[in-house]
């Protein structure tokens, strides 16, 4: 008889917790999100003037045209369905070759001298492969290339970069970063790239 009562009690607790944690709590979070955080609860989507979704402020995109600031490399080619890192060990020869190749390409694209330090986020993919940010230092090294390609004053491009720079969380966690999608959208508004330019 005692086992039967314990079984009934277990089933009641399981049902109650399933209802509470599997139904009421998610519903409450959904309602609070929709009311108080509508932009974030929809995925921080960025739309153009016609309402078409361009991307998300939370997910990186690939920019490889010389007139754009370039994002971090991605092991998953910015595919949200297969996000992740390369999972190569630091001692992996494949990783070392990839980093060497990316460093050479970054130096060439940005006309850097062999002694100019290359920021790690310019050649290393993030763990998710979807990071929307680059470091401020990475952005600074790309300013001359972007300014040249857009026929703009490098100082005005740098000002735009500084405007889009986010400070470390609480002033101490992390480093200054720049959301590449938001920065490139602002570039297109201020310095449109004409076809055949």
Swiss-Prot record:
The listed locations are: Cell inner membrane
Q: Which residues form a coiled coil?
A: none
UniProt cross-references to InterPro entries, sorted A to Z: KdpC (IPR003820)
Show the GO MF annotations: ATP binding; P-type potassium transmembrane transporter activity
Q: Does the keyword Transcription apply?
A: no
Task: Look up keyword Cell membrane and say if it applies.
Answer: yes
Q: What is its main location?
A: membrane
Which terms are listed as keywords in the entry?
Answer: ATP-binding, Cell inner membrane, Cell membrane, Ion transport, Membrane, Nucleotide-binding, Potassium, Potassium transport, Transmembrane, Transmembrane helix, Transport
GO annotations of cellular component type: plasma membrane
Question: Source organism's superkingdom?
Answer: Bacteria
Q: Sorted alphabetically, which Pfam families does this protein's record hold?
A: KdpC (PF02669)
The way it spans or sits in the membrane comes to: Single-pass membrane protein
Annotated membrane-spanning segments are: 13-33
Q: How does it assemble?
A: The system is composed of three essential subunits: KdpA, KdpB and KdpC.
Q: What does this protein do?
A: Part of the high-affinity ATP-driven potassium transport (or Kdp) system, which catalyzes the hydrolysis of ATP coupled with the electrogenic transport of potassium into the cytoplasm. This subunit acts as a catalytic chaperone that increases the ATP-binding affinity of the ATP-hydrolyzing subunit KdpB by the formation of a transient KdpB/KdpC/ATP ternary complex.
Q: Which PANTHER family match?
A: POTASSIUM-TRANSPORTING ATPASE C CHAIN, POTASSIUM-TRANSPORTING ATPASE KDPC SUBUNIT
Of which family is this protein a member?
A: Belongs to the KdpC family.
The record's HAMAP family line, in alphabetical order, gives:
KdpC (MF_00276)
Q: Please state what the protein is called.
A: Potassium-transporting ATPase KdpC subunit
Q: Which organism is it from?
A: Methylacidiphilum infernorum (isolate V4) (Methylokorus infernorum (strain V4))
* Source lineage: Bacteria, Pseudomonadati, Verrucomicrobiota, Methylacidiphilae, Methylacidiphilales
């Amino acid at each position: 008889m005692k086992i039967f009562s314990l079984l009934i009690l277990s089933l009641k607790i399981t049902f109650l917790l399933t209802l509470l944690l599997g139904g009421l709590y998610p519903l409450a979070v959904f309602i609070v999100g929709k009311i108080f955080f509508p932009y974030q609860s929809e995925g921080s989507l960025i739309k153009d003037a016609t309402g078409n979704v361009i991307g998300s402020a939370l997910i990186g995109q690939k920019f490889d045209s010389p007139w754009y600031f370039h994002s971090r490399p991605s092991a998953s080619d910015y595919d949200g369905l297969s996000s992740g890192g390369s999972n190569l060990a630091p001692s992996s020869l494949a990783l070392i070759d990839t980093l060497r190749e990316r460093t050479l390409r970054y130096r060439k694209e940005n006309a850097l001298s062999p002694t100019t330090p290359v920021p790690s986020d310019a050649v290393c993919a993030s763990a998710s492969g979807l990071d929307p940010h680059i470091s401020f230092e990475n952005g600074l090294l790309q300013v001359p290339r972007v300014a040249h390609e857009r026929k703009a004053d490098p100082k005005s491009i740098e000002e735009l970069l500084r405007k889009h720079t986010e400070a470390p969380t609480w002033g101490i966690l992390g480093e200054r970063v720049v959301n590449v999608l938001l920065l490139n959208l602002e570039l297109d508004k201020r310095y449109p790239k004409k076809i055949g330019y």
